């Protein structure tokens, strides 16, 4: 019954905004198992459909139905096209003959008394699983596994909202069969590389794993043994798991807080937990902790904002401890127990605030190591930049008067702050500035980067000239070097490799105005991820794709109707999803989500573009974003590239930051069967000699700090699947190290006094007595 109601709601949603386009779906949200064993749902949206044009290697259940199921039993690239009175685009679907068919399903129970979490795991087959399992809301494990592939864009609403209550019988049988064959899952944590194993299979056909709650080891993977059943294995499941992210129910009588009428959707999510998100619309504001499977309204208490102010929301940022709203030009803070205006008592201007910005990249270990001394939010006016610290207290970082002095500009010139963003470097942020001597029709755009370790601003070799009325935004990409994407309403600009290369993104035809290729629509949203994907979404839902370090954009196949209200965000596996909003539906159906098969869509358009990756494989042993190196220590990194013979590729090491490390490199080369394998061994170390120096502490200060590195192939293209590994090396004393005292029971809270003694002969400074320290 639930499935029928949800599907009916989605159909009603689509009926309000019909135009000719077509999509495809599978039963799973994990496109890595898209294969010859998948049931591919085809859906044509519009009134001019006649039939489907299908290759002989595939079969369709009903060729004349706008909604039907496709099966392709032969691996390869299959061209699918609807025959309609209007000319429709064809797609080239890449169907693999994969042995990965089954999926893991899990539920989580939070145990607060010992800060642990119980994870119940079972295996399910998307093709034969229950409706509840498909919508990912089962509370008990499902043990049946059959081959099942699903397309997120065509998945049922039930699959997307996860409403299953118990495992299906098929999943129960499958899990027991896999267990008999030797399957035994475990949870692997990506950052700390820990493994948590279950007890024996329960009578309900589930494995139960106990693991601690964590804020610095949240990226996890469910993996299993290499066990085959009916020639199929289980796909690894990547997900995020941390302390429960609570959302607050609004008391009765609170009033809507919205964007101005006609505004496109605005999304904000937690830096590390993308499932904890907030959506602002011109009707309501919503908050979720499960990727909009469920949600609550976020409203303002009466008496604080006027009616006009409540409908003048300009920006919003969501954090675990509160939500920041920019209403007109004033910042308001909403927490569990208050809704207040921030002013000079919090270190920030009461009016004139133009925008808010937060960290875009999750750097868990570094954040955990020194979070107390770093900002987590930025705010700015035309002439001032503020940094926000713990408890939402701010400090002014700079003014345009100081920046004019830094840039050696005449006092009479006009210099304004456009926007401010954090870079990938954990200690840096950057301000985009507008400068003109005589402001006529254009303005010059410059950039300065702020380093919080030295409290310094540095002008970058980046300059653009844009129309005076242009409204600019930008993002730093996932890169050791400062790489950025800047955009206004119509164009996208780039600055790559520490601004050594910059310009305007073009299409294959040479067009730079994306609005002219999307019926005059403006740029709405730019989504970036950690593997170099950049998706540019227009207000009418036309989407363009840009790859990091590539200067050309390609238009993606139409997926969403031009009148639908949508936004892009990441699900719990950090895959791209589309969020739909329709205020005309029943309240519980107003928000719908669908995973978007970005990789399949890229493969489809590339069939005509002929853009292929120049290498076959690029591998490395970089398993963390953060490495610490103390005196006398070294770090060895292994990287390897495999490419066709005579291409002459190699691996490039790039770094950003203080030159306080030395490294040596050794290259191994091998040719076999027309392919070259080049392996690069890099060893990082320090050559500073601290023995018997008079300026020990000064020398130590000069040779400690943070460097950011990345390895990348010398050539790459839009279709290269692997990301360049980016990592930090922190050189110096590890502040997380402590003196450990053994031999005591941890269950008690009895305070004990300890002390230690260091022999005076071992100390650098001459002392008459041994050094005694109390703990």
From Swiss-Prot:
Residues 1-20 form the signal peptide. Keywords: Glycoprotein, Signal. The keyword Glycoprotein applies. InterPro entries: CATSPERD/E (IPR028751), CATSPERE_b-prop (IPR053816), CATSPERE_Ig-like (IPR053815), CATSPERE_NTD1 (IPR053818), CATSPERE_NTD2 (IPR053817). The keyword Glycoprotein applies. Glycans are attached at residues 62, 114. Pfam families: Beta-prop_CATSPERE, CATSPERE_Ig-like, CATSPERE_NTD1, CATSPERE_NTD2. GO terms for cellular component: CatSper complex. Belongs to the CATSPERD family. This is Cation channel sperm-associated protein subunit epsilon-like protein. It comes from Mus musculus (Mouse).
């Amino acid at each position: 019954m639930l499935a029928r109601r949800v599907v009916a709601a989605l159909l009603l949603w689509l009926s309000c905004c019909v135009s000719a386009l077509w999509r495809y779906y599978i039963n799973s949200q994990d496109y890595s198992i898209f294969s010859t064993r998948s049931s591919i749902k085809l859906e044509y949206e519009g009134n001019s459909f006649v039939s489907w044009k299908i290759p002989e290697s595939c079969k369709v259940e009903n060729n004349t139905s706008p909604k039907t199921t496709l099966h392709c039993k032969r691996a390869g690239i299959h061209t699918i096209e609807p025959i309609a009175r209007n000319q429709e685009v064809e797609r080239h679907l890449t169907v693999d003959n994969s042995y990965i068919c089954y999926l893991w399903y899990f539920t989580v129970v939070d145990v607060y008394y010992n800060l642990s979490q119980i994870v119940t795991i079972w295996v399910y087959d998307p093709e034969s699983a229950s409706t509840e399992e498909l919508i990912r809301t089962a509370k008990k494990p499902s043990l049946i596994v059959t081959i099942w592939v699903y397309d997120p864009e065509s998945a049922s609403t039930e699959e997307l909202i996860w409403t299953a209550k118990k495992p299906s019988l098929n999943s129960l049988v499958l899990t027991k069969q896999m267990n008999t064959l030797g399957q035994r899952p475990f949870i692997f944590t990506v950052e700390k590389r820990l493994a948590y194993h279950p007890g024996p299979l329960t009578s309900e056909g589930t494995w139960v794993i106990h693991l601690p709650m964590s804020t610095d080891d949240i990226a996890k993977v469910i993996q299993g043994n290499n066990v085959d059943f009916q020639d199929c294995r289980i796909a690894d499941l990547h997900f995020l798991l941390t302390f429960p992210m609570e959302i607050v129910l609004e008391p009765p009588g609170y009033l809507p807080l919205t964007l101005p009428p006609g505004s496109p959707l605005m999304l904000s999510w937690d830096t590390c937990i993308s499932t904890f998100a907030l959506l602002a619309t011109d009707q309501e504001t919503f908050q979720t902790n499960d990727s909009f499977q469920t949600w609550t309204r976020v409203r303002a208490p009466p008496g604080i904002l006027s009616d006009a102010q409540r409908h003048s929301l300009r920006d919003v940022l969501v954090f675990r401890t509160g939500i920041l709203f920019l209403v007109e030009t004033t910042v308001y803070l909403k927490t569990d127990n208050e809704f207040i205006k921030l002013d000079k008592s919090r270190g920030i201007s009461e009016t004139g605030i133009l925008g808010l910005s937060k960290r875009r990249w999750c750097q868990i270990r570094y954040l955990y190591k020194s979070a107390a001394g770093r900002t987590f939010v930025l705010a700015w006016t035309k002439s001032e930049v503020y940094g926000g610290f713990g408890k939402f207290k701010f400090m002014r970082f700079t003014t345009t008067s100081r920046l004019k002095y830094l840039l050696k500009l005449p006092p009479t010139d006009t210099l304004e702050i456009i926007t401010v963003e954090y870079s990938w470097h954990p200690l840096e942020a950057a301000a985009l500035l507008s400068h003109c001597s005589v402001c006529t029709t254009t303005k010059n755009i410059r950039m300065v980067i702020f380093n919080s370790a030295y409290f310094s601003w540095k002008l970058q070799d980046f300059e653009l000239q844009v129309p005076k009325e242009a409204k600019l935004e930008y993002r730093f990409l996932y890169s050791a070097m400062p790489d950025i994407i800047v955009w206004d309403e119509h164009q996208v600009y780039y600055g790559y490799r520490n601004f050594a290369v910059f310009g305007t993104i073009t299409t294959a035809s040479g067009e730079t105005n994306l609005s002219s290729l999307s019926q005059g629509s403006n740029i709405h949203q730019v989504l970036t991820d950690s593997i170099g994907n950049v998706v540019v979404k227009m207000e009418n839902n036309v989407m363009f794709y840009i790859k990091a370090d590539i200067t050309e954009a390609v238009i993606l196949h139409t997926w969403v109707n031009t009148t639908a209200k949508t936004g892009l965000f990441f699900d719990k596996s950090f895959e791209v999803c589309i969020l739909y909003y329709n205020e005309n539906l029943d309240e519980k159906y107003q928000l719908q989500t669908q995973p978007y098969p970005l990789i399949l869509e890229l493969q489809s358009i590339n069939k005509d573009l002929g853009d292929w990756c120049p290498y076959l494989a690029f591998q490395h042993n970089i398993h963390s974003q953060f490495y610490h190196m103390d005196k006398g220590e070294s770090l060895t990194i292994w990287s390897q590239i495999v490419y066709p013979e005579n291409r002459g590729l190699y691996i490039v090491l790039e770094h950003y930051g203080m030159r306080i490390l030395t490294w040596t490199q050794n290259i191994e080369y091998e040719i076999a069967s027309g392919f070259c394998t080049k392996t690069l061994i890099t060893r990082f170390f320090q050559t500073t000699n601290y023995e018997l120096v008079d300026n020990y502490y000064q020398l130590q200060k000069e040779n400690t700090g943070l460097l950011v590195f990345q390895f990348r192939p010398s050539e790459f293209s839009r279709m290269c699947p692997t990301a360049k590994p980016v990592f930090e090396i922190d050189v110096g004393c590890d502040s997380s190290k402590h003196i450990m005292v053994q031999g005591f029971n941890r269950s008690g809270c009895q305070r004990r006094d300890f002390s230690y003694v260091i022999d005076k002969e071992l100390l650098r400074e001459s002392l008459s007595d041994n050094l005694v320290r109390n703990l």
